[in-house]
């Protein structure tokens, strides 16, 4: 029986960082990396010291889940780790964003997470773990990042509930809620031909520090991982203040009306 790890969104950003360092978490016979861009996944495979299987799949296409399910079924495997890192956001008013983009975002950020968890969990033995990338945006509504924030709130809530459901099977689930992080996320989130909506960042963290904290908290069996003083303060304040006040502060900080 081959022991594997499965990582989505592995072609760039946080997903790539996790794929490059997964051997810090544990030892696997093979690491399956999933993303749309096959060339980038192949480049990743050439740089890591462990066996990698490339699955070039678009997780907004529901047919991709059939391909993934078939790949699991055709080879005797146990999945020791599932990491759902696929996702993106847009800094834009809802009505200024094409409907297709907003629906695609919800498909990738939410439906793909549900599908990957449900398909993979039957192959996960006791002691295995699911890690879903959420965001500190999950803790409050954020105007002009509406869809992204709402999808990450879904991921956080889903992950915590699933963690409780799978406890009897010995499978842990953790949601990672980072603050602003220096990745390619911003290349897709910001329209290059317009004045950025988000102008001020309270902090910007190094992705390597997020990765290290994630591996540490996963080994400790936590259900939520938050890195950085600012992230913890923001998450804490959303429990104390009305969300209307939190949104007012955000709008004022970004000079929005």
Regions found by a protein language model. Give the residues of each.
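C-terminal helical subdomain
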Residues: 175, 197-232
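Substrate-binding pocket helix/loop in short-chain dehydrogenase/reductase
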Residues: 93-95, 101-104
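Conserved glycine-rich cofactor-binding loop
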Residues: 11-12
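Conserved NAD(P)H cofactor-binding loop of Rossmann-fold oxidoreductase domains
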Residues: 85-90
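Residue(s) in the substrate-gating loop at a strand-loop-helix junction
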Residues: 135
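Active-site helix of classical SDR
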Residues: 117, 151
């Amino acid at each position: 029986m081959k022991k594997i790890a499965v990582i989505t969104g592995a072609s760039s950003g946080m997903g790539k960082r996790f794929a490059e360092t997964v051997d810090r978490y544990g030892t696997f016979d093979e690491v399956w990396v999933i993303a749309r861009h096959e060339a980038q996944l192949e480049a990743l495979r050439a740089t890591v010291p462990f066996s990698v299987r490339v699955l070039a799949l678009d997780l907004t296409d529901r047919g991709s889940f059939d391909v993934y399910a078939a790949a699991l079924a055709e080879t005797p495997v146990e999945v020791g780790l599932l990491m759902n890192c696929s996702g993106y956001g847009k800094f834009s008013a809802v009505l200024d964003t094409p409907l297709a983009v907003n629906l695609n975002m919800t498909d990738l950020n939410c439906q793909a997470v549900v599908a990957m968890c449900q398909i993979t969990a039957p192959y996960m033995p006791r002691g295995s773990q699911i890690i879903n990338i959420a965001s500190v945006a999950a803790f409050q509504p954020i105007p002009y990042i509406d869809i992204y924030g709402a999808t990450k709130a879904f991921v956080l809530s889903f992950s915590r509930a699933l963690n409780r459901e799978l406890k009897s099977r010995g499978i842990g689930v953790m949601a990672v809620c980072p603050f602003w992080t220096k990745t390619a996320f911003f290349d897709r989130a910001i329209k290059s031909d317009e004045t950025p909506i988000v102008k001020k960042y309270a902090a910007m963290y190094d992705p390597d520090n997020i990765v290290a904290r994630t591996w540490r908290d996963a080994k400790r069996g936590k259900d939520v991982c938050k890195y950085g003083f600012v992230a913890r303060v923001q998450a804490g304040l959303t429990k104390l203040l009305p969300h209307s006040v939190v949104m007012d502060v955000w709008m004022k900080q970004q000079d929005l009306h």
